[in-house]
From Swiss-Prot:
UniProt enzyme class: hydrolase
Stated name of the protein: ATP-dependent protease subunit HslV
Family to which the UniProt record says this protein belongs: Belongs to the peptidase T1B family. HslV subfamily.
SUPFAM superfamilies associated with the record: N-terminal nucleophile aminohydrolases (Ntn hydrolases)
Native source species: Rickettsia prowazekii (strain Madrid E)
Regulation of catalytic or functional activity: Allosterically activated by HslU binding.
Gene giving rise to this polypeptide: hslV
CDD domains: protease_HslV
Main localization category: cytoplasm
EC number from the UniProt entry: 3.4.25.2
């Protein structure tokens, strides 16, 4: 099995409904077709819990990028968009960073951003973003639920969407962890 396949072996979902922003992640760590851990924590908070980061891909690479983002957040006074763009510049220009196999979703009260392994910074439409092998399942479910279930909270939509993704993606599980942007 290709090592590149490990890059997408997870599900991270972020959504905003009204003023509520939730990031959710499954807990499964896989290597090839083997589950190594089912209770991993793939979400981190920075800037006094005002910014939440979820990462998919190589754990070591994700943590390395998280540390670099945290430095940028401190450097640019918790300005998420500026910090993400500056990290992306470094990511594109640094030989070491370009080899890292990870993607991140980062969110604060104003922005939901996807940072890709190519150094892209993408602000998704429709207030929903997802990455990882189960990302498209979670994204589709969340967009449908947001369109047709007005009575559900952001947290309820995230949980239902993540469970659908876990039902369909063998590299994601039902051990869902959620963080709310404050």
């Amino acid at each position: 099995m290709s090592d590149n396949f490990a890059l997408h072996g997870t599900t991270i979902l972020c959504l905003k409904k009204k003023e509520e922003i939730i990031i959710a992640a499954d807990g499964q760590v896989s290597h090839g077709n083997t589950v190594l851990k089912s209770t991993a924590r793939k979400l981190r908070t920075i800037a006094n819990n005002k910014i939440i980061v979820g990462f998919a891909g190589s754990t070591a690479d994700g943590l390395a990028l998280f540390e670099k983002l945290e430095i940028k957040i401190e450097q640019y006074n918790s300005n998420l968009l500026r910090s993400a763009v500056e990290l992306a510049k470094d990511w594109r220009n640094d030989k070491y960073l370009r080899r890292l196999e990870a993607m991140m979703i980062v969110a604060d009260r104003s922005h939901i951003l996807i940072l890709t392994g190519n150094g892209d910074v993408i602000e998704p439409e429709n207030n929903v973003a997802a990455i990882g092998s189960g990302g498209l399942f979670a994204l589709s479910a969340a967009r449908a639920l947001m369109s047709y279930e007005n009575n559900l909270t952001a947290e309820e939509i995230a949980l239902k969407s993540m469970n659908i993704a876990a039902d369909l993606c063998v590299f994601s599980n039902h051990n869902i962890i959620m963080e709310k942007v404050v």
